[in-house]
Amino acid sequence: MSHFALVAPPYPSHFAAMQALGGELVERGHQVSFFHQPEAERWLSDSRLGFVAIGHAECPPGSLDLAMRRVADPAGPLRPRRLIKQLAHTTGMLISNLPQALRDHRVDAVI
């Protein structure tokens, strides 16, 4: 069967939705792996799904918690700017690291 890579914004709700999809793919006989910054692995609870940590240099320990605190802060007009900046950083990390990781892990399709 195929090896599917799951890539989502670094938010628990997005990971939960993708994890449900990944579980269904595993039930159908596929291999499924999340690809993201190391700290995002904590949001996975389905042991059937793999996790490939990428972006170690761009996302050092503590960076995900800091990003979550900044995005969750409802105060002021800068919240949308912080969200966009955080997503741009994540996108840059994925663009830099994901292609090689997908090749290394012989991924057939990306969701």
Outline where the language-model segments fall.
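Glycosyltransferase specificity loop/lid
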Residues: 1-111
